[in-house]
């Protein structure tokens, strides 16, 4: 059992503003990559979910709290875990750390939708994969 997924990010100049601080919207890209890698680590992909089940994952809600800025050449660790799973959605908690100290906290609600954009039941293989990252 995994319980939480870890993903490392190195901050490059392209990620920062003119002051060398990570531009706020770039944190969302880092979080997306970490969530995707969490799912990929179980053998699933977004393309597989679409081809096998006709579904994909969308972000319904994102709450983010920037506690301390990341800067040029920092190495960050993103910890991702599943807080809860319902029939059509799941909640992920993500923590970004620098040197083992939390600098950003995010909580997202993700919904499974069909090709018409309507919420639909989470496929069993995805549900089983998500459970590996829940407490």
Predicted regions and their residues:
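Generic structural detector for well-ordered beta-strands
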Residues: 8-12, 65, 109-111
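Basic, polyanion-binding surface patches
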Residues: 93
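Hydrophobic beta-strand-centered segment that forms part of the acyl-chain substrate-binding groove
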Residues: 39-90, 104, 110
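Hot-dog-fold acyl-thioester-processing enzymes
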Residues: 2-59, 115-135
């Amino acid at each position: 059992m995994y319980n939480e997924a870890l993903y490392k990010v190195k901050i490059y100049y392209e990620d920062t503003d003119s002051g060398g601080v990570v531009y706020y919207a770039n944190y969302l890209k880092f979080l997306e990559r970490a969530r995707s890698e969490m799912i990929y680590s179980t053998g699933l992909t977004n393309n597989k979910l679409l081809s096998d089940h006709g579904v994909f994952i969308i972000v319904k809600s994102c709450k983010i709290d920037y506690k301390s800025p990341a800067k040029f050449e920092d190495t960050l660790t993103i910890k991702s875990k599943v807080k809860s799973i319902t029939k059509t959605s799941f909640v992920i908690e993500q923590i970004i750390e620098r040197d083992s100290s939390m600098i950003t906290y995010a909580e997202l609600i993700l919904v499974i939708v069909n090709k018409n954009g309507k919420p639909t039941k989470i496929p069993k293989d995805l549900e089983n994969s998500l459970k590996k990252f829940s407490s």
